[in-house]
């Protein structure tokens, strides 16, 4: 094992000099026993000097400190021993639960599956959330993006998806918290504990307050754990909150390494780094990784290079809208902006497809009529348009749903709605079968039976 010495420290970037014949390779892990910090080699500068990123605070480091080369990339524990545990970017436990006795350790840098190993299953993954199952269904082994600005509910939606899928489908999940709030990570841990699904989830956190190196690599740590479960032949879920912070950490690292920035100050290697991560999130003939990724949209601008680069890799996009959140409709999913490759009659069936398109058609017509209503009022509309508007308002409210993970805030018990019920109920609304019910009865309920019961209760209170 070769040793070198620190020659320069600039924030998280540390230059280390080795004997010319014993230079480490790119992505090798170097360790300081004295400061208990791991470094990852990013550039070979020549004359025996390598430029590295510290996977921890560089406080306490000094020039001349001895650094050892491990001769390998960062390796993290994988397998069942990681379930129910919180780990950092190096796979070390941070939950005071003792050591992780994993049967194996894998490198966080791995090649994507070969082309002939990939599978192309079109099986649907039912989430129990009406608006998602109807309008932007998820594929088992697909990639989903939850797009939204600050505070529109990305993390809450993700927590609900983990809870529903873990409880209803009983599969393993890996959650990578990339550069998010420590408070959310804490809430998330206790939410999983209360829902009795913690023993099926591996948690890997690289929070906002951690150095850029940790935030940049923590997604790869989580992905490596998910890949192990896939290679065992399992169907695993991989959650990332938040992909934007992964890009942002890459931008910080890139600037520290002295690379020239590209559009909007992002790193020039943005598309390559995103591709390396996303291409590994794949389903093979052995097992599948279904990935759900929260994507923060800076200033609600979907054309920003970071969300725009992410779009290209996804099968389904769930766009969370501030305008819908302002109406008090949660989940605040935009039914006209959200898309899915699975919404195809050959995949979901003719009834599901036609119901989804009719729901979108009604909402689109309502959107067009809104300006006329604002200027002239409802009375100036034709009878057909009046019917469209009342149905659209009912559909809009029926797309809301009480969440299990938000019970403490809303006071309403959460609801899981099977897909067949969702299709039946929305078809009935657009067919006009429930034109006699008040629109308020459709707000924050699960199935149509609840909406009818709510309407009867409202009528009884009015008498």
UniProtKB/Swiss-Prot annotation:
GO terms for molecular function: ATP binding; ATP hydrolysis activity; proton-transporting ATP synthase activity, rotational mechanism. Signal peptide: none annotated. The keyword Membrane applies. It comes from the Bacteria. Keywords: ATP synthesis, ATP-binding, Cell inner membrane, Cell membrane, CF(1), Hydrogen ion transport, Ion transport, Membrane, Nucleotide-binding, Translocase, Transport. Pfam families: ATP-synt_ab, ATP-synt_ab_N, ATP-synt_VA_C. Its EC number is 7.1.2.2. GO terms for cellular component: plasma membrane; proton-transporting ATP synthase complex. The keyword Ion transport applies. ATP binds at residues 148-155. SMART domains: AAA. F-type ATPases have 2 components, CF(1) - the catalytic core - and CF(0) - the membrane proton channel. CF(1) has five subunits: alpha(3), beta(3), gamma(1), delta(1), epsilon(1). CF(0) has three main subunits: a(1), b(2) and c(9-12). The alpha and beta chains form an alternating ring which encloses part of the gamma chain. CF(1) is attached to CF(0) by a central stalk formed by the gamma and epsilon chains, while a peripheral stalk is formed by the delta and b chains. Belongs to the ATPase alpha/beta chains family. Produces ATP from ADP in the presence of a proton gradient across the membrane. The catalytic sites are hosted primarily by the beta subunits. This is ATP synthase subunit beta. It comes from Dichelobacter nodosus (strain VCS1703A). The lineage of its organism: Bacteria, Pseudomonadati, Pseudomonadota, Gammaproteobacteria, Cardiobacteriales.
């Amino acid at each position: 094992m070769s040793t070198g010495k620190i020659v320069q420290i600039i924030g998280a970037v540390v230059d280390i000099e080795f004997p010319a014949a014993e230079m480490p390779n790119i992505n090798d892990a170097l360790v300081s026993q004295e400061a208990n910090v791991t470094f990852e080699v990013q550039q070979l500068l020549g004359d025996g000097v390598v430029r590295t990123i510290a996977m921890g605070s560089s406080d306490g480091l000094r020039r001349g400190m001895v650094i050892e080369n491990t001769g390998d990339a960062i390796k993290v524990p994988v397998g069942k021993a990681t379930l129910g545990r919180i780990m950092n970017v190096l796979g070390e436990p941070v939950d005071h639960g003792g050591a992780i006795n994993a049967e194996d350790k894998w490198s966080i840098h791995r090649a994507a599956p070969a082309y002939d190993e990939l599978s192309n299953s079109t099986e649907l993954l039912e989430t129990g959330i009406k608006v998602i199952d109807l309008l932007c269904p998820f594929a088992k082994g697909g990639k989903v993006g939850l797009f939204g600005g600050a505070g529109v509910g990305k993390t809450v939606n993700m927590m609900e998806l983990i809870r529903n899928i873990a409880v209803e489908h009983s599969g393993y999940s890996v959650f990578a918290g990339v550069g998010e709030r420590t408070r959310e990570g804490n809430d998330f841990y206790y939410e999983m504990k209360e829902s009795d699904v913690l023993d099926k989830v591996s948690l890997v956190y690289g929070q906002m307050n951690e150095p850029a190196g940790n935030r940049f690599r923590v997604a790869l740590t989580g992905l490596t754990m998910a890949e192990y479960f896939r290679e065992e032949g399992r169907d695993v879920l991989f959650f990332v909150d938040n992909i934007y912070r992964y890009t942002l950490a890459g931008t910080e690292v890139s600037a520290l390494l002295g690379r020239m920035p590209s559009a909007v100050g992002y790193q020039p290697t943005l598309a390559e780094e995103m591709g390396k991560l996303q291409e590994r999130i794949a389903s093979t003939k052995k097992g599948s990784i279904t990935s759900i990724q929260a994507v923060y949209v800076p200033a609600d601008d979907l054309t920003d290079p970071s969300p725009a680069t992410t779009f290209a890799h996804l099968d389904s996009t769930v766009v969370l809208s501030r305008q819908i959140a302002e109406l008090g409709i949660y989940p605040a999913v935009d039914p006209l902006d959200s898309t899915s490759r699975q919404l195809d009659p050959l995949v979901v069936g003719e009834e599901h497809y036609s119901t989804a398109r009719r729901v979108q058609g009604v909402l689109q017509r309502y959107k067009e009529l809104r300006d006329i209503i604002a200027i002239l009022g409802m009375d100036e509309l034709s009878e057909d348009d009046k019917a469209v508007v009342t149905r659209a308002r009912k559909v809009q409210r029926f797309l809301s749903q009480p969440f299990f993970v938000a019970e403490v805030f809303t006071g309403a018990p959460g609801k899981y709605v099977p897909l067949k019920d969702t299709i039946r109920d929305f078809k009935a609304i657009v067919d006009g079968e429930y034109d006699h019910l008040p629109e308020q009865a459709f707000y924050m309920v699960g199935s149509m039976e609840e909406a009818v019961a709510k309407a009867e209760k409202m009528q009884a209170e009015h008498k």
